[in-house]
Amino acid sequence: MKTFACTFFLSFVLVFSIYADTAYPVIVVAQDGSGDFITIQDAINSVRDFTPVPRVIHIKKGIYYEKVEIPSWKCDITLKGDGPEETLIYYDDYASLRRMGTFRTYTLQIRGNRVTLENLTVENRAGRVGQAVALHVEGDCVAVRNCRLLGNQDTLFTGNENSRQYYDRCYIEGTTDYIFGPATCWFDHCILHSLSLIHISE
């Protein structure tokens, strides 16, 4: 079983490496108006549904206060920042706010397949007020590279048991259950930082 799992994930990583090194059309998001769009969501919405050509959305340096959604019909998209310290996406919803519940508190939700995040930070700034998700992933074949995922309780939700996810050189922090969900995930050279005295189970 372990051999099968390793073979599967090595194949998964190889495919994404080839995918990442290929040149695709680029959409630019810049808060100063120098790009194609000012908001990340508008850039995502501009991508053709079930696009036959993968698209790269370059999010320039800035702090973006947005609740971002990549729906299931938006696939083959890469969100690429200028670096985890330079490109920051944040929101501040939490479970008891308007009784929204845990699974609607995300800052960024990914439901599309073959989505990649690179060189950026996703943060939920609600604070220690209970469940508050930063990144919510349900899509299949999702890769997250060189990113920071910041929050407190429930920072990263790896939703959907049929989802396969790859996290490479990421920094993930939180308190209670800050990585949770039924997906199959591989964490490669990631740093997990517990903000309180809790145990991490394997």
PLM features: residue spans?
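Positively charged n-region of N-terminal signal peptides that target proteins for export
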Residues: 1-5
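Sequence-level preference for short, compositionally simple segments enriched
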Residues: 21-197, 201
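Bacterial N-terminal signal peptides
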Residues: 7-17
